[in-house]
Amino acid sequence: MPGYDDGRVACTDDEIVIRHYYLAGAKRIKYQAIREVRSVPLGTMGKLRIHGSGDLVHWFNFDPRRPRKDTALVIYLDGRIRPVITPDDPARVAAELADHGVRVTAGRESGLW
């Protein structure tokens, strides 16, 4: 698979780049640092979260198109904060992550309803 880039989320050869994660920049996460990525349905509260966190656990990058999306990918790292992304093609990002050895599961996530 040749990679992925929708302008907000990009999968490179060795990391995922989450643009507009911080007010003035991107967050780069090496694939080896990811414990798991969970694909979850995005409820009303998640759809309305354009940027930031409502529970101090899930952190959403800036995505003004999020209200029209139905699926989020929650990235589990070693720390308490879980980055949450809503790529334009979540299935393709999940496949790209799996191709790089990241465990990808599906389920539910409290705090995103």
Residue ranges of predicted features:
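Short, charged, intrinsically disordered terminal tails
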Residues: D99-W113
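Short, well-ordered beta-strand segments enriched in hydrophobic/aromatic residues
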Residues: D14-H20
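A membrane-cytosol interface segment of integral membrane proteins
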Residues: P67-R103
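Bulky hydrophobic/aromatic packing residues
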Residues: E15, T86, E109-G111
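Non-transmembrane, membrane-adjacent beta-strand/coil modules in membrane-associated proteins
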Residues: P2-G7, H20-I29, A33-R80, S110-W113
